[in-house]
Amino acid sequence: MKSLLSTLVIIMFLAHLVTGGWYVKKCANTLGNCRKMCRDGEKQTEPATSKCPIGKLCCVLDFKISGHCGGGGQNSDNLVTAGGDEGSSAKASTAAMVGAAAMAGTPTKTSAPAKTSAPAKTSTTTKASNAAKASTTTKASNAAKASAATMAGNTTKVSTAAIASTPAQASTPTKANST
């Protein structure tokens, strides 16, 4: 029984020795094997990254080198460049959104106000007695006078100077209810 087991161990040892399972040094980030000559379907990598002993080459399979080193359809440098371009455009669009939100949140005077016949009244409390009054987010008295902040979904109060419907009303102060 012992001789059968020892014979099996010797055969397994020789099989691994011949196939190179135990004594093959890995190279190119464990993608390739160090050999004297590369086989069919393998390519030699650069000597600087091989880590093979003198006189041996680092051989990596074609499909592994194309995905790892960029030898396939796309170059790895192009992938990095494309990612950098996307990041800069994303940063630019984010900055534009932040700038637009900051502008929409601050009350500004209108140079060309909307002309309506309704009076420019504002109130601190929301009264739902008139259907022409704006929603509670802007607290404006007329829906036509709502600013761009309301259209964007911003919930800031709109100043009376920004809601004035005519230039004459913009120059005169408007009355506010204090109830």
UniProtKB/Swiss-Prot annotation:
Let me know which tissues express this protein, per UniProt.
Answer: Specifically expressed in corpus epididymis and cauda epididymis with expression in corpus being highest (at protein level). Not detected in other tissues tested, including testis, prostate, seminal vesicle and vas deferens (at protein level).
The UniProt PTM text for this protein says: O-glycosylated; glycans contain alpha(2,3)-linked sialic acids.
For this entry, the protein name equals: Beta-defensin 22
Give the family this protein belongs to, as stated in its UniProt record.
Belongs to the beta-defensin family.
Highest taxon in the source lineage: Eukaryota
GO cellular component, alphabetical, reads: acrosomal vesicle; cell surface; extracellular region; sperm glycocalyx
Q: What does this protein do?
A: Probable component of sperm glycocalyx. Likely protects and facilitates transport of sperm in the female reproductive tract. Probably released from the sperm surface during capacitation.
Q: Tell me, which GO biological process terms does this entry list?
A: innate immune response
Disulphide-bonded residues: C27-C58, C34-C52, C38-C59
> Region (Disordered): which ranges?
105-152
Q: Which residues form the signal peptide?
A: 1-20
Grouped into one coarse class, the protein's main location is cytoplasm
Source organism of the structure: Mus musculus (Mouse)
Q: Which compartment or compartments is the protein found in?
A: Cytoplasmic vesicle, Secretory vesicle, Acrosome; Secreted, Extracellular space
Keywords of the record, alphabetical order, are:
Cytoplasmic vesicle, Disulfide bond, Glycoprotein, Secreted, Signal
| Any single Pfam family the record assigns to this protein | Defensin_beta_2
Q: Which InterPro entries does its entry note?
A: Beta_defensin_dom
Task: Show the ranges annotated as biased composition (Low complexity).
Answer: 105-150
